[in-house]
Amino acid sequence: MSDKNPRYSRILLKLSGEALAGTKDMGIDTEVLDKMSLSIAHLRGLGVQVGIVVGGGNLYRGAQLQKEGLVGRVTGDQMGMLATVMNGLAMRDALERRNIKTRLMSALPIGEVTESYSSRNAIRYLKNGEVCIFVAGTGNPFFTTDTAACLRGIEIEAGLILKATKVDGVYDKDPSLHSDAVKYDGLTFDEVLEQKLGVMDLTAIALCREHDVPLQVFDMNKPNALLNVVMGENEGTRVYH
């Protein structure tokens, strides 16, 4: 594999908050941060340009508060956006400890903490060899960070959007609950939408389909899985037009 060139020169990686929590129920697992920053360092060493969208579910889950009427949907979503900023700060520092220059770009203006998101600036940074972490989702309530990942991937002209999960791809049903669950090696966007497989929310899938940007779902805990995907190896589940 070391003799091959990467299949993709620019990617968008989606890291959910739950993935960052690792084996914990909440919070950030430092081992996950360390492993992921190392994987990204390997990609940068191969010249791959990397954009990252992080979720916030490991720090804030608003469903219960909203259910109990303590906060409204808009407020809850805004709290979730702020949680992604905290995750982004942690990921930025993990990357910079490996001497990888990293930009933290927010869809919400947060003066002294991040810079405001601009697709033109992001592409410029990526071309200069910097990693860009995109936080605060789309900046709007009612949109998931999965949708934000697809949107940012399209805006920065990524060749592939990768979703890092705790399972090794997409199954016809939850493999943690059903021993007979069947894994898909490949699916079309239409099949995902028709079967409602839950790869990402429907808005995110529709965006990728409309702009013909492939999606790869892989197990972030499997050694070298991220590198394998970018090198074009068979890993996880591919969703395509």
Swiss-Prot record:
ATP binds at K14, L15, S16, G17, G57, R61, T165, Y171, D174. It is an enzyme of class 2 (transferase). Keywords: ATP-binding, Cytoplasm, Kinase, Nucleotide-binding, Pyrimidine biosynthesis, Transferase. It is found in: Cytoplasm. Pathway: Pyrimidine metabolism; CTP biosynthesis via de novo pathway; UDP from UMP (UMPK route): step 1/1. UMP binds at G56, D77, T138, G139, N140, P141, F142, F143, T144, T145. NCBIfam families: pyrH_bact (TIGR02075). Catalyzes the reversible phosphorylation of UMP to UDP. This is Uridylate kinase. It comes from Psychrobacter cryohalolentis (strain ATCC BAA-1226 / DSM 17306 / VKM B-2378 / K5). The gene is pyrH.
